[in-house]
Regions:
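A short helix-loop-beta submotif of the ANL/AMP-binding
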Residues: 134-141
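Conserved beta-loop-alpha segment that forms the PLP phosphate-binding cup at the N-terminus of a helix
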Residues: 73, 92-120
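Active-site phosphate-binding strand-loop segment of PLP-dependent enzymes
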Residues: 151-221
Length: 224
């Protein structure tokens, strides 16, 4: 027996308008970052997955809570070694938190830093989901223009000075310095040091998104 209830009367008053019914990908698809399906080594993946299941199957079939809320420790140890080797940082497995994708990571960061009405600095063109997540919790993203080397640091300083003159201090600066989304630019190392100087001068932390940082084919990966 179905209940005759008008559920829309229980919805939040500030919900966004319903999206259009799904009709398939557009002709030029920029939805999601993924490899060309023809290049995926399916046979090698099957072999690797089979080996892991034989070795860790019982652990993988359960929640694995024995490793604590930060996630599966062997994976955290692997990630910490990779970060130390490739990004120039020095971290341990205890500094790593496993999340269900970048969306959950962004939500946790926003929950830790932001209140409704706060301001966050972002690149003028940036990861759409990051912007939407800020707006959804009542945070105002302030965009700074880009060039072929990433965020314009001169304009970033101008924007910060203008906001501070109005007694507005952004909670953090969200940037994608390596293979920027959607521009694809890579911030030079000298600019990275300048960005750190800006962060120190204005006492505003940086949230660095390195989703595509491994996709560099013709040069070494710059430091985080």
């Amino acid at each position: 027996m179905a209940l005759d209830i008008e559920y829309s009367t229980f919805f939040k008053s500030d919900l966004p308008a319903p999206s259009q019914r799904w009709s398939g990908f557009p002709e030029y698809n920029f939805i999601g970052g993924h490899n060309d399906a023809e290049t995926i080594p399916v046979d090698d993946m099957i072999k690797s997955i089979s080996e892991v299941l034989k070795r860790e199957g019982k652990t993988l079939a359960t929640y694995g809570l024995q490793h604590g809320p930060q996630g599966y420790k062997p994976l955290r140890e692997f990630i910490s070694k990779k970060v130390n080797k490739r990004s120039g940082l020095s971290v341990s497995s205890d500094d790593i938190l496993i999340t269900s994708g970048s969306g959950q990571a962004l939500d946790l960061i926003n929950a830790a830093f932001c209140n409704p009405g706060d301001t966050v600095i972002v690149e003028q063109f940036s990861y759409g989901s990051a912007i939407n997540r800020l707006r959804r919790i009542g945070v105002k993203p302030i965009g700074v223009p880009l060039n072929d080397e990433g965020i314009r640091l001169d304009l970033l300083v101008e924007r910060l000075e203008d906001l501070l003159d109005k007694s507005i201090k952004p909670k953090f600066i969200y940037v994608i310095p390596t293979v920027q989304n959607p521009a694809g630019s890579i911030m030079p190392e000298k600019n990275r040091f300048k960005l750190l100087e800006v962060s120190k001068k204005f006492q505003i932390p940086i949230v660095e998104d390195e989703c595509y940082a491994d996709l560099i084919w013709d040069s070494s990966r710059p430091p985080a």
